[in-house]
């Protein structure tokens, strides 16, 4: 088995770690960053991922997709998605299967497909770093992700060419990294506020055991919402001062988004920052500039209710764990938003202790994922991880009631069975409606799937015995089966993302991703060949200029002809033609190099009697050491 990489697939940024021996190591991207923006952009010619996609977002807002994690496993008409549509510069639609998708240049991309593009970039960066092919990964998800969102994440990994060995909850991964090699037993709370999601997990860590006691959260609360509050404020202030509504201008909104994110970060360390966006828009009177000061106090006033929304899940998680805030030994902060002083203050007040900031909030989740990869590969020994399912699972029963089979915060993997019966006389089949959630009525919870158990022999209602079994694997993914105990007939369903990608669609997207990988490789080879050709032309032309009249006309004409031939093909896309022309010019330029070398030797003092009238005769031996120096007669030439 090769290396298993650990990936934190974040809303705003993603990060990759790998175990090197017993130590987790961050894999930097080619740009030198330890995290990679979770952004994909489409241009007329190519697809861009990461930093390069982020850099061009202002000039290409409608084709630059960010925060796609917020759409994973969600319906196109879900309230959260409809809310996100109002702020998003790119187009969000309901796909053919009803799931949220993005539409760029007339083509629809599922959230899993866009996430796969990000994962593909992370995979390629890991391969470049390790110098070997990477096929296995552990990918993290928010603890409060439901089954559909987990399955969509796993599908994204498959499309990117990764065998996802384990889906692990982000706070659990963070606690794994925090508790790695710790011997003391502690009850910890992992407060994880990232770019798009919030999780709180209560765990017991120590003596190489990490046990999740309870988890809670909000999968639509994060840094993107904080940025949006700042954007709304800037738009309103600019409208009040200039009478211009920037919210209608997508390019201006993208500039505002970048400025809002930067201001938010700046205010974590300073009390005031200045937002300066020249030429943000124009009207009949000319260009308009946005220049505004934003204080930390104003920012905190804008977002205080968002921070307060994190407290209730903390309260619920503690109650589910059967603990009080005073019984928590450490509160570990995870996610970039926990750098905000107001967040740290509110967390400290709720738990009654100063939060622990000893871990890197941007990297600790990926580090934990890599440690989990090491456990699965057998490289990390004697570490036991006990995770939980975040939401209750059950089926719909008579009267539209949600009957739980597995309660939330049950340790996984787990298996639970319960026997049900028919609701009518001579009922030939039963429909099993599988649900996930906490509401008492089935209609208020999320549908994971439906299947039919047919062929039940005619009998009075209440007579047939149908055993329904729920099985949750270590990834938190659900399998459900129903068995007629009278006939032994059984029917089962592996719950996939609700109305999600079919197997044939996944296979098609895998092939497309592989094809893109080949295209990207060829494109990279073409760019490298062009760069080498450009360098060769520059060096050869410089050599010709340096030699001047000392280069005979025939040689000069031959080389210049080869330079023109290379220039003609290097802007094209024929890689072999560029390589051939480069090789021909390279061979010809060797003669130049020889002549240039001889010329440089002749012009230097100590090069011999031919060095020129003003030169001295050279030493007869080399000067490697005193023993090798040979005295020689010399004649002083007087001018």
From Swiss-Prot:
Keywords: ATP-binding, Chaperone, Nucleotide-binding, Phosphoprotein, Stress response. Residues 594-623 have a biased composition (Low complexity). GO terms for molecular function: ATP binding; ATP-dependent protein folding chaperone; unfolded protein binding. Disulfide bonds: none annotated. Residues 589-639 are annotated as: Disordered. The keyword Phosphoprotein applies. The modification Phosphothreonine is found at residue 197. Induction: By stress conditions e.g. heat shock. Residues 628-639 have a biased composition (Acidic residues). The keyword 4Fe-4S does not apply. It holds the Pfam family HSP70. PROSITE patterns: HSP70_1, HSP70_2, HSP70_3. Signal peptide: none annotated. NCBIfam families: PRK00290.1 (NF001413), PRK05183.1 (NF003520), prok_dnaK (TIGR02350). Acts as a chaperone. HAMAP family: DnaK. Belongs to the heat shock protein 70 family. This is Chaperone protein DnaK. It comes from Nitratidesulfovibrio vulgaris (strain DSM 19637 / Miyazaki F) (Desulfovibrio vulgaris).
